C-alpha cells in the first residue's frame, strides 16, 4: 500500500487539523514546514474559526478585526495582570512604597461609614491611614506571555482601571500613577492625574478611574501601577481612601490597521 503525504489531503481537511493544534505550535512548528502549510496557517478563515471555537467571538460578531491572528492571541492572553486586586490575600503581591500613619490595612465591605461595591463579587478593600500610604506592582509583560513584536508592531490597548471611595465621616486624598516602561525601566508613557480630594461628610460612593494607553512608543516591556492616599484630618486609624478591584488589561483595538506579518511567539 502506497504511503500518502499529508499534503495530498484536501485543504479543508488540513485546515480542520490545524484547528485543533495549539496556536503557538502552529506558528512555531507547523508554519515553517512548507509553503502550503504557511499559506493555510496565514488564512483569515483559520484564525476566525479558532476564535469562534474558543468563544472569543460569536457567529453574529460584527465589529471589524484587522488581523484575526493577532486578535486570537490577544484574546487568549487577556486577563487582569494585577495580582490580588481585591485584597482577598491580604497584602500579598503588593510592594508597600509608603506605609504612613497606622499603615495599610484590609477591611471587608462595606466598612464603617461606607457603601456597598457595585460588583457584589468584590468583598474586601485596602484602606489607608492619616499619613501617605502607597502600594505598587510591576508587571513584566514578557513573563506574562507578550512577545516583543506583538507589543511593538501592533501596540494593543492597555486599559487601566481602579476604584476608590472615602469614608462618609472623613475627608481624604486619593492618587494613582501608571507608567509604561522599557526593558531597562525607562518611562515611555504615563498616566498620573492630579490627586483627588474628597471633603468630609460625603456620600462614600465608589468611583472608577479609567485610562487607556493607545499608540504608545515601541519598546514597552513593563507596567508600573501605584495607588493610595491618606485622610485629610489626620485621625488615628484608617480613615483614608479605600481602594479595590484594580485592573490592567491588554486588549485588541479592533479599528486599528496593523502590519500583516507577525513573527513567531
UniProtKB/Swiss-Prot annotation:
<feature type="domain" description="F-box">
    <location>
        <begin position="3"/>
        <end position="50"/>
    </location>
</feature>
<dbReference type="GO" id="GO:0006281">
    <property type="term" value="P:DNA repair"/>
</dbReference>
<comment type="function">
    <text>Substrate-recognition component of some SCF (SKP1-CUL1-F-box protein)-type E3 ubiquitin ligase complexes. Involved in endoplasmic reticulum-associated degradation pathway (ERAD) for misfolded lumenal proteins by recognizing and binding sugar chains on unfolded glycoproteins that are retrotranslocated into the cytosol and promoting their ubiquitination and subsequent degradation. Able to recognize and bind denatured glycoproteins, which are modified with not only high-mannose but also complex-type oligosaccharides. Also recognizes sulfated glycans.</text>
</comment>
<dbReference type="InterPro" id="IPR036047">
    <property type="entry name" value="F-box-like_dom_sf"/>
</dbReference>
<dbReference type="InterPro" id="IPR001810">
    <property type="entry name" value="F-box_dom"/>
</dbReference>
<dbReference type="GO" id="GO:0016567">
    <property type="term" value="P:protein ubiquitination"/>
</dbReference>
<keyword id="KW-0963">Cytoplasm</keyword>
<dbReference type="GO" id="GO:0005737">
    <property type="term" value="C:cytoplasm"/>
</dbReference>
<keyword id="KW-0234">DNA repair</keyword>
<keyword id="KW-0834">Unfolded protein response</keyword>
<protein>
    <recommendedName>
        <fullName>F-box only protein 6</fullName>
    </recommendedName>
</protein>
<keyword id="KW-0227">DNA damage</keyword>
<keyword id="KW-0833">Ubl conjugation pathway</keyword>
<feature type="domain" description="FBA">
    <location>
        <begin position="71"/>
        <end position="252"/>
    </location>
</feature>
<dbReference type="GO" id="GO:0019005">
    <property type="term" value="C:SCF ubiquitin ligase complex"/>
</dbReference>
<keyword id="KW-0597">Phosphoprotein</keyword>
<comment type="pathway">
    <text>Protein modification; protein ubiquitination.</text>
</comment>
<dbReference type="GO" id="GO:0036503">
    <property type="term" value="P:ERAD pathway"/>
</dbReference>
<feature type="modified residue" description="Phosphoserine">
    <location>
        <position position="251"/>
    </location>
</feature>
<dbReference type="Pfam" id="PF12937">
    <property type="entry name" value="F-box-like"/>
</dbReference>
<dbReference type="GO" id="GO:0044322">
    <property type="term" value="C:endoplasmic reticulum quality control compartment"/>
</dbReference>
<comment type="subunit">
    <text>Part of a SCF (SKP1-cullin-F-box) protein ligase complex. Interacts with VCP, CHEK1 and CUL1.</text>
</comment>
<dbReference type="GO" id="GO:0006516">
    <property type="term" value="P:glycoprotein catabolic process"/>
</dbReference>
<dbReference type="InterPro" id="IPR039752">
    <property type="entry name" value="F-box_only"/>
</dbReference>
<dbReference type="GO" id="GO:0031146">
    <property type="term" value="P:SCF-dependent proteasomal ubiquitin-dependent protein catabolic process"/>
</dbReference>
<dbReference type="GO" id="GO:0006986">
    <property type="term" value="P:response to unfolded protein"/>
</dbReference>
<dbReference type="InterPro" id="IPR007397">
    <property type="entry name" value="F-box-assoc_dom"/>
</dbReference>
<dbReference type="Pfam" id="PF04300">
    <property type="entry name" value="FBA"/>
</dbReference>
<dbReference type="InterPro" id="IPR008979">
    <property type="entry name" value="Galactose-bd-like_sf"/>
</dbReference>
